[in-house]
Amino acid sequence: MSSRENPSGICKSIPKLISSFVDTFVDYSVSGIFLPQDPSSQNEILQTRFEKPERLVAIGDLHGDLEKSREAFKIAGLIDSSDRWTGGSTMVVQVGDVLDRGGEELKILYFLEKLKREAERAGGKILTMNGNHEIMNIEGDFRYVTKKGLEEFQIWADWYCLGNKMKTLCSGLDKPKDPYEGIPMSFPRMRADCFEGIRARIAALRPDGPIAKRFLTKNQTVAVVGDSVFVHGGLLAEHIEYGLERINEEVRGWINGFKGGRYAPAYCRGGNSVVWLRKFSEEMAHKCDCAALEHALSTIPGVKRMIMGHTIQDAGINGVCNDKAIRIDVGMSKGCADGLPEVLEIRRDSGVRIVTSNPLYKENLYSHVAPDSKTGLGLLVPVPKQVEVKA
């Protein structure tokens, strides 16, 4: 029977269509991106291990700076001037810390989600990870939030609540959940002009919050890609013994609000946790615990290097412990060190190299700042011509 012969079938679908339209309207108002809801992804198993791709690109901490985030993707040839995916079958791992220190955190989350979908259609893949700042924000720890960051979430909350009001006008839809349920109207020892931004941020990012559930539940906390293991801070043997898949699923369950309450699992909290560890990312190589690193790597079959963010490397992307630890946080966000974007590239046929936007390399690869004489960087890039420079 056709829809013309059975108009009731069309009528029954109208509430869902209206709900979808409202969600898309809210998304565009917040981010400038049309991003249809993708409910099926919420039920997918969070994959931990991946085969080595032909081309793998690793990107460090982004911290609320959309302009620098775009630049990092552009120098790697992953997007065009209209932010469309051009990376083909490339696999990308972004090691976390999208949140805090900048005012475009939500825009980056939408930007990454859009690119994930475009990459999948082209045969590529983008993995996003949880950093310590994602964990902190889900817990309600906003020490590193900026004024613009509060404003961005307040704008989101205004649109989100407007969307909910629009849905209540449509019979046939369940009453939307109040995102502010249980959140106090004010906070002691806090400026009154911050109240609404803080409330909006709690509403969005707490366990089972709309933004946490939609975006952050898709994040890995640990990922093994070919012969590399990715983590925001670092992995110790005890974390690996606990189980990498187990860590990913438990953190995801906590973000979804299934268990654990306000605070993250213990292995995500404290100085020796997977998102806070700095044993392998200290800028001074002699301070890195290479023995602990080698022990950890030896417990993951087939893995020969650990790639991490978390600690800003003033010298740029570099390796220590015979390149078994590669540190890729270059502090690119203007809220951090305003560093020049760099990304790590691993090709199956030609190994590891650094792609940088640093104009000094472009001017004279054999100058005093050539990579073979740059502290730390030379450990990864033995000869200058292995550095690719993009404007």
Curated annotation (Swiss-Prot):
Expressed in roots and siliques (at protein level). Shows phosphatase activity, hydrolyzing the artificial substrate para-nitrophenylphosphate (pNPP) in vitro. InterPro entries: Calcineurin-like_PHP_ApaH, Metallo-depent_PP-like, MPP_Shelphs. It is found in: Cytoplasm, Cytosol. GO terms for cellular component: cytosol. Its EC number is 3.1.-.-. Disruption phenotype: No visible phenotype under normal growth conditions. Its main location: cytoplasm. Belongs to the metallophosphoesterase superfamily. SLP family. Mn(2+) 2 binds at residues 97, 132, 232, 295. Disulfide bonds: none annotated. This is Shewanella-like protein phosphatase 2. Binds 2 manganese ions per subunit. It comes from Arabidopsis thaliana. Its cofactor is Mn(2+). It is an enzyme of class 3 (hydrolase). Induction: By infection with the bacterial pathogen P.syringae. The active site is at 133 (proton donor). Keywords: Cytoplasm, Hydrolase, Manganese, Metal-binding, Protein phosphatase. Mn(2+) 1 binds at residues 61, 63, 97. GO terms for molecular function: manganese ion binding; phosphatase activity; phosphoprotein phosphatase activity.
